[in-house]
C-alpha cells in the first residue's frame, strides 16, 4: 500500500479519509506559522478514520510516495517539492487562475478566451465611486479570500453598508487595496466542467451538473466529447497553460453562455471544488489510483460506481465561530463529508475555520443509476445527521432540476436520459 501525505488547511478532512481506503495516509494542517497560534487548527483532523494526524510534515516527505494538496494556498511549497523530485498532486502555479483574479483575466485574454467587461479598481474611494456610477456588478477580492467572498452590487445604496464595513476592516490598506469588478454577463444559461486535469489533459468522462449556490448540486457522468461546446472550448483554450503549469488536480469551471453561444469564464476552481468534489470521492471507485497516478504526471481514467449524484450542503451558523458537536448514524457515515472535522473522546466536532465565518460545514450525498435514486438516497442519508443548529439543504437538489431543464432548453445537454419534473419529486 502506497504512503501519502495530505497537506491541508482543514476543509478536506473527508478527502483524507477517502484516500485512506487505498493508501496509508498522514494528515497535516499548518498551525504554528504565526506568532500566536490557536489550538483549533492543531486539532483539525484528529480521530479521522484510518488517518494519522501529524505535527510535522517535513519528517515525512522522504517517507511517503506522494504528497497531496487538496486546497489552494500552497503553490510555492508544491512547486518547491516538485522541483526537488517529490511527487505532488496539486495545482501548483495553476492555482493563480483561481486566487489571482486580475491575472486570471489577463491569462484568459492571452489564451484567446472571451472576457466580459471588468475593471481593476484600486482603493476604497475609487471602488465607492465606481459602484456609485455602475449597477449590476460583482466585486471580487484577489488573493485574500479571507477578507470577503464575492458580493453583488445591484446599486450603490444597497451596497453601501457592505462597503463601509469593508473600508473599516481594511484599515490603513483602504487606499491601496485592489478589487476586481465584473459587470453582469447577459447570459441565458450557466455551464461548466467538473472533473480533473493532468498536465493539460482531461479524462474521457467527467461529472457535469448544476449548483444551487451554497446549498446543493445535481450531477451526472458524461462523456467528455458529449459536453456542450462552450465547456470544451474553455478547457481546450486553458489546456496549454495547465500543461505548462504542471497542473495535476481536480478542476472546475463556471461559464456563462450568451444567446449567441459565447462562453464567458466567470470563475475557476483549482482545488477540491465544494461542491461537488464530495461526489467524486464516492462516485469514482478508483479515486486513490487517480490521485497517485496524477501526482506522478499520469492520467488514469475514472471507474464510476453510479451515473448520478445528488449533494446537499450542510449548514450551521453556530459553527461559524464555535466548536459545533455533530453526530452521524453509522449506517450513513460513508455519505456525510464534514469539513474541519475532528473526533475527540468519541465525539465529532466541526472546528471553526480560522479567519473567516463559514456556515457551510459539510456535504450530504447520494448516488444512483437514475437521478431519482440519487436524490432519494441523499434525502435518506440526511436523516442520519445531527448537530447544533444544523440544516441539510435537501430542498436544493430538487430546485436544481429547474436549472437543468433551463440548460437543456438552451442546448446545454445534462443527460441523454429524460429528466423528471420538479413537481414529481416534491
Protein language model annotation of sequence segments:
Residues 1-93:
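ATP-binding N-terminal substructure of ATP-dependent carboxylate-amine bond-forming enzymes
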Residues 47-53, 97, 119-120, 152, ...:
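A structural signal for short, well-ordered beta-strand elements
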Residues 91-157, 161-172:
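A conserved helix-loop-beta module that forms one wall/lid of the active-site cleft
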Residues 141-142, 182-186, 242-246, 302-303, ...:
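Short Gly/Pro-enriched turn/cap motifs at secondary-structure boundaries
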Residues 150-273:
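Internal nucleotide-binding/catalytic subdomain
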Residues 230-252, 259, 269-335:
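Active-site "cap" helix and flanking loop/linker of ATP-utilizing ligase/carboxylase catalytic domains
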Residues 292-426:
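Peripheral (often C-terminal) accessory segments that flank ATP-dependent C-N-forming ligase machineries
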Amino acid at each position: 500500500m502506497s504512503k501519502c501525505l495530505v497537506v491541508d488547511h482543514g476543509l478536506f478532512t473527508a478527502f483524507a479519509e477517502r484516500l485512506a481506503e487505498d493508501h496509508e495516509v498522514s494528515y497535516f494542517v499548518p498551525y504554528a506559522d504565526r506568532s500566536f497560534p490557536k489550538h483549533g487548527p492543531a486539532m483539525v483532523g484528529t480521530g479521522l478514520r484510518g488517518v494519522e494526524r501529524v505535527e510535522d510534515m517535513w519528517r515525512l516527505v522522504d517517507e511517503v510516495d506522494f504528497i497531496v494538496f487538496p486546497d489552494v494556498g500552497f503553490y510555492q511549497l508544491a512547486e518547491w517539492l516538485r522541483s526537488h523530485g517529490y511527487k505532488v498532486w496539486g495545482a501548483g502555479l495553476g492555482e493563480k487562475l483561481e486566487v489571482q483574479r486580475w491575472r486570471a483575466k489577463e491569462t484568459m485574454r492571452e489564451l484567446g478566451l472571451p472576457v466580459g467587461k471588468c475593471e481593476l479598481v484600486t482603493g476604497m474611494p475609487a471602488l465607492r465611486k465606481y459602484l456609485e456610477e455602475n449597477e449590476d456588478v460583482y466585486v471580487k477580492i484577489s488573493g485574500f479570500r479571507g477578507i470577503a467572498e464575492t458580493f453583488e452590487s445591484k446599486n450603490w445604496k444597497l451596497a453601501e453598508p457592505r462597503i463601509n464595513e469593508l473600508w473599516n476592516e481594511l484599515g490603513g490598506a483602504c487606499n491601496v487595496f485592489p478589487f476586481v469588478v465584473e459587470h453582469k454577463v447577459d447570459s441565458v444559461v450557466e455551464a461548466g466542467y467538473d472533473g480533473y486535469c493532468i498536465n493539460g489533459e482531461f479524462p474521457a468522462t467527467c461529472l457535469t451538473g448544476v449548483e444551487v449556490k451554497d446549498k446543493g448540486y445535481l450531477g451526472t457522468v458524461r462523456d467528455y466529447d458529449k459536453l456542450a461546446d462552450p465547456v470544451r472550448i474553455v478547457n481546450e483554450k486553458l489546456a496549454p497553460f495547465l500543461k505548462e503549469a504542471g497542473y495535476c488536480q481536480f478542476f472546475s469551471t463556471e461559464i456563462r453562455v450568451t444567446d449567441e453561444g459565447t462562453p464567458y469564464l466567470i470563475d475557476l476552481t483549482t482545488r477540491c471544488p465544494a461542491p461537488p468534489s464530495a461526489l467524486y470521492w464516492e462516485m469514482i471507485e478508483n479515486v486513490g489510483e487517480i490521485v497517485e497516478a496524477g501526482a506522478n504526471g499520469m492520467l488514469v481514467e475514472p471507474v464510476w460506481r453510479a451515473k448520478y449524484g445528488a449533494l446537499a450542503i450542510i449548514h450551521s451558523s453556530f459553527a461559524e465561530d464555535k466548536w459545533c458537536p455533530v453526530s452521524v448514524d453509522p449506517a450513513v457515515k460513508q455519505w456525510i463529508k464534514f469539513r474541519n472535522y475532528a473526533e475527540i473522546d468519541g465525539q465529532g466536532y466541526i472546528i471553526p475555520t480560522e479567519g473567516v465565518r463559514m456556515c457551510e460545514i459539510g456535504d450530504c450525498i447520494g448516488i444512483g443509476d437514475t437521478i431519482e435514486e440519487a436524490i432519494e438516497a441523499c434525502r435518506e442519508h440526511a436523516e442520519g445527521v445531527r448537530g447544533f443548529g444544523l440544516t441539510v439543504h435537501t430542498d436544493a437538489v430538487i430546485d436544481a432540476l429547474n436549472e437543468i431543464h433551463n440548460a437543456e432548453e438552451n442546448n446545454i445537454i445534462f443527460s441523454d436520459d429524460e429528466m423528471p419534473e420538479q413537481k414529481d419529486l416534491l
